[in-house]
Amino acid sequence: MKKNFSAIIAVIFAVGAALYAQTTEQGKQDALFLYNSGRFEEAIKICQKEIEQNPNRVDSYVVMCWSLVRSRQYAEAELRANAGLLVSPYDLRLIEILGEARFYLGKNNGAMEQFQKYIAAAPENGARVGTAYYFMGELYVRKARYLHADIALSAAVRKEPLLERWWVRLGYAREMAKNYRGSLSAYDEALRLNPSSADAQNGRTRVASLLQ
């Protein structure tokens, strides 16, 4: 009888643990689903609850920070990313999103440091490598270091060649560096991707007049 009772208790605990794991995994999926659906505030609330239940749940910090940046809550994103990095100091997702938060806060040196860390550690096919190069390019533009911006933005468009906005910014960096032919080429590519891009058309007109 005691053996049967012990077996029943063991089964109850096993089922409970399985249900808890399933609920936890479902919570992660729900938060990520909400983020991917553009429902950032809802995703943030779910992640907050998950972190309250388990402060070491790194995925919750990641999805929360992504959602905070997308909802333009940059100071909170910086705070949460730093908290997540205390739990997992080498998580590349947190390293990169902290760079984005600092970029939008105008913390140029801190942002650059994060993107450089990410590029140094991420594999060539890392999910955010192109994005990190793009932000580095924008940071160099802010500092009027246009040759460096050209290098970073060129790397960005090699990784993700279908983003018209990135080609426009590459055209602008080259224009400021007085590389007019290279600038014209970048603006032309932006217009090929999006013929209605006013920024690309205006940039191309400026550069073409300088080449005459």
Model-based region annotation:
Residues 53, 87-88, 121-125, 159, ...:
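Structural marker of alpha-solenoid helical repeat scaffolds
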